[in-house]
Amino acid sequence: MLLGASLVGVLLFSKLVLKLPWTQVGFSLLFLYLGSGGWRFIRVFIKTIRRDIFGGLVLLKVKAKVRQCLRERRTVPILFASTVRRHPDKTALIFEGTDTLWTFRQLDEYSSSVANFLQARGLASGDVAAIFMENRNEFVGLWLGMAKLGVEAALINTNLRRDAQLHCLTTSRARALVFGSEMASAICEIHASLDPSLSLFCSGSWEPNAVPTSTEHLDPLLKDAPKHLPICPDKGFTDKLFYIYTSGTTGLPKAAIVVHSRYYRMAALVYYGFRMRPNDIVYDCLPLYHSAGNIVGIGQCLLHGMTVVIRKKFSASRFWDDCIKYNCTIVQYIGELCRYLLNQPPREAENQHQVRMALGNGLRQSIWTNFSSRFHIPQVAEFYGATECNCSLGNFDSQVGACGFNSRILSFVYPIRLVRVNEDTMELIRGPDGICIPCQPGEPGQLVGRIIQKDPLRRFDGYLNQGANDKKIAKDVFKKGDQAYLTGDVLVMDELGYLYFRDRTGDTFRWKGENVSTTEVEGTLSRLLDMADVAVYGVEVPGTEGRAGMAAVASPTGNCDLERFAQVLEKELPLYARPIFLRLLPELHKTGTYKFQKTELRKEGFDPAIVKDPLFYLDARKGRYVPLDQEAYSRIQAGEEKL
């Protein structure tokens, strides 16, 4: 702005006052421009203009399609119906576990059976039904069938047990629960605490003695249900589709609301931004209860007619064999998955596949080039975006290490920003005018996205819990009176506008591809340790993605039955949430508001040369906590100890 005003001033002064010829005026302006650092702008412009134009066109295309869907009140089931009409007999889903193949027509008929059956059982538009099962074709057919009826699906994380699992079912107010037979034991554990009015249905192998007494076998009931489309509910593009549970920033899992427009937007931005094709075949081994697997992956099938291969769980040893068997051209990943593949011994299969794109997030810069070159993958399509966020990013031109970009030239087109935060408290830093201070290139800051509720691409749908929404929204961020979504993630932007993931703030960290809520883990550990003070945080471990969980426990005597503690943890917490490291110390220091001071604990980490308190780590082979001495620390640092 200042540079522009200066140029105009020089132009007027040179021409009107000095009466110089236009050639001299031009040289004067060029001299001033370059002298004021304008050459940086020219450099950025030349290097990024093609990228920015392409990104802008993608944004405009998706925005136009979203507006059309809004006008015509289209929903995901309506959009899927048009996909079925285009190619009814094309393969839609393949389940690797049984080689079960569903065409688009079969998926359509199965989902309609689900809708008609639930309608016959009294469920109606606006009701909620929960799904608790491992990956398979039926998972997609179930929530899609619910959507056809206007019933909102609550997609429960299959790793959750007991309190967390019960919390998800209770807060969703589900009237029905469909669970896979493989999850029967987990349902039996909480059956006594479930609402007696909750209808229970089991899909898969049927053993009456292995499920709660009130459970019905769903599969034969669906075979008898009508396969025609039920009467369409009065739903619009901004109405609720389903709920995905996320740890958010604190506490037990929260239900993030996914509306039809959000589902479309997330899938479409990936499709157009990374130049996908309708004849691509996607290999999806990510959990379908998360947005990466169910929206970014399955969304390409439902909305764009791709074939998606579903795997129950990721297998490093079978990964490339599967890709060859099913002729996959796109694979989905999380950063940890890529490291597992690189740790596998070389094999012929990794050179015989047809994969042209790896799509996902969390791939570290240190292994990025090695991953793409060893496995001969031309395009790494890295993106950033939580289920509930309004500031998704895409690395459309495969810049190594970047999770996306924002134009330095036309930054106002996509209103996101990195803002300064206090390193210790993670509070937003504001200027004298009360507005958040934007970061300069190279300066880490929290990513925020401006909220515009009337714009489907900028709206924040939030969580079912209003209190959780309040914690994710800040005011006066871009300008006075506005609102912005707080991602809780620290990124850094380079001079060209590429964004790189740095850290996860708030009270979560990421481990084994899952967000771990420190508050939830702290509560569980404290309860198991007779309400001792416990601080949980993530620590970096060389050669691994994310942060490993570490728990600092206030234990004045230093005594703890760690063997029994490890056994109980197996029943109370999913594997990814169990602390890898333990630190026993006399007391935990707190802030004036009784929050644990974790900054120093994080900095000290688990190095026995720095930490003088007793340290322990979870030995994966022994299944218990053992002392962490200098020798064990060296093995962990060298990657010789499995965590």
Curated annotation (Swiss-Prot):
Could you state one GO cellular component term attached to this entry?
Answer: endoplasmic reticulum membrane
Catalytic reaction(s) noted: a fatty acid(in) = a fatty acid(out); (9Z,12Z)-octadecadienoate(out) = (9Z,12Z)-octadecadienoate(in); (9Z)-octadecenoate(out) = (9Z)-octadecenoate(in); hexadecanoate(out) = hexadecanoate(in)
In this chain, AMP is annotated as bound at 243-254
Per its UniProt record, what PROSITE patterns does this chain match?
A: AMP_BINDING
Keywords of the record, alphabetical order, are: Endoplasmic reticulum, Fatty acid metabolism, Ligase, Lipid metabolism, Lipid transport, Membrane, Nucleotide-binding, Transmembrane, Transmembrane helix, Transport
Molecular functions (GO terms) = arachidonate-CoA ligase activity; long-chain fatty acid transmembrane transporter activity; nucleotide binding; oleoyl-CoA ligase activity; very long-chain fatty acid-CoA ligase activity
The answer to keyword Transmembrane helix applying to this record is yes
Which biological process, per GO, is one annotated for this protein?
medium-chain fatty acid transport
Q: Where in the cell is it found?
A: Endoplasmic reticulum membrane
Q: Where are the transmembrane segments?
A: 20-42, 139-156
What EC class is this? ligase
* Enzyme Commission number, as recorded: 6.2.1.15, 6.2.1.3, 6.2.1.-
Membrane topology summary: Multi-pass membrane protein
What function does the entry list?
A: Mediates the import of long-chain fatty acids (LCFA) into the cell by facilitating their transport across cell membranes. Appears to be the principal fatty acid transporter in small intestinal enterocytes. Also functions as an acyl-CoA ligase catalyzing the ATP-dependent formation of fatty acyl-CoA using LCFA and very-long-chain fatty acids (VLCFA) as substrates, which prevents fatty acid efflux from cells and might drive more fatty acid uptake. Plays a role in the formation of the epidermal barrier. Required for fat absorption in early embryogenesis.
**Family assignment from sequence similarity:** Belongs to the ATP-dependent AMP-binding enzyme family.
Q: What is this protein called?
A: Long-chain fatty acid transport protein 4
Q: Which organism is it from?
A: Pongo abelii (Sumatran orangutan)
Supply the gene name: SLC27A4
